[in-house]
Structures are given as structure tokens and as C-alpha cells.
């Protein structure tokens, strides 16, 4: 499976955005060290925004392009449709539900088969959830203290389009998120403009 490689904190500083969720990721960021601090052309600004979004969700270029095509072919506004596609990925929803402390960790957990989706084992991070789908931490995986602590510590801090059943280690994708509810600082219209050329 292809992975996004390279120093993660350095990537965050280069993009001018904490895309890994670690509190120290931007600690050494000085003025002038990120692309966001430099004067860019319109194309450069659009490209940077695309790279930020792709890095945030940990998606490779080819897959990201497929998502963009799907968004443009949908009946919704392309930028919001793209965010909805990315947000509904299993690895992201595992993170949003509080099973993992980062999308990167969530992807590893999914790869290792720690979850059931609607009662069936799914180990594909890019698997797309539908509204109403249930994600459950497998019984044997509940013996891992880190997984249990992640989930219990996140109770009350989940996004509004997710509900959780603490006793059952279950998360439910309850509804389509509103744009303002998705906790990511991205100007998706710039990405739409980038791919509209």
C-alpha cells in the first residue's frame, strides 16, 4: 500500500498548516519558512491548498484526483462534495469517532483489522461509510489499553455528525455534516478552481 512518507512536522511547516494533529507540529515554524508565508501566484495558492487538503487526509495524488472527479460529477457543490467524500472515509471516521488520536493512527488500526462496519470486518482505510453505518472496535482489540483510552478520553468531544456508545465501543455516522462542522481550515473553492482549468 502506498504511503505518504517524509518528516511529518517539516511537511506541516512547509504547508503552513498542522495536517498531522500533533500539538508540536508547528512549534518550530518561523516566519518565512512555509510556502504560505511566501508570495505565490494564483496557481501556487491553489496548488498549496490542494496539497494541504491531500496531506490532512493522507491521500495519495491518484486517489485524490479520483475523488475530485467524483465531486465534479456529483449534483452538489464540488468543493463540499469533495470534503464529504474525504470525511466519509473509514480511517477518517475512526479518527472522528475517537478511536485514534490521529488519522495516521486510525489508518494503521484499520489496516490491522481492528474494526467491524455493520458487523463485518473491514480493513480498507479508503472504505466509504454511508449515513447510519456503525463502526465497532472488535472484541479482541479492546484488550489494547491505548485503543480503549483513546475512545473513552474522547467522549464529549466528537463532531456533531457522529454519535458514540461508550459501553459498546461503537461509533455511528449519523448524518451528513454541514460544511462549518467539518473541523478543517481549508478553502475548498481554491481546489475547485485548480481543477477547473
Swiss-Prot record:
The keyword Ribosomal protein applies. Belongs to the universal ribosomal protein uS4 family. CDD domains: S4. Keywords: Ribonucleoprotein, Ribosomal protein, RNA-binding, rRNA-binding. SMART domains: Ribosomal_S4, S4. It holds the Pfam family S4. One of its GO terms (molecular function) is rRNA binding. Residues 88-150 form the S4 RNA-binding domain. One of the primary rRNA binding proteins, it binds directly to 16S rRNA where it nucleates assembly of the body of the 30S subunit. One of its GO terms (cellular component) is small ribosomal subunit. InterPro entries: Ribosomal_uS4, Ribosomal_uS4_bac-type, Ribosomal_uS4_CS, Ribosomal_uS4_N, S4_RNA-bd, S4_RNA-bd_sf. This is Small ribosomal subunit protein uS4B. GO terms for biological process: ribosomal small subunit biogenesis; translation. It comes from the Bacteria. The keyword Acetylation does not apply. Part of the 30S ribosomal subunit. Contacts protein S5. The interaction surface between S4 and S5 is involved in control of translational fidelity. Signal peptide: none annotated.
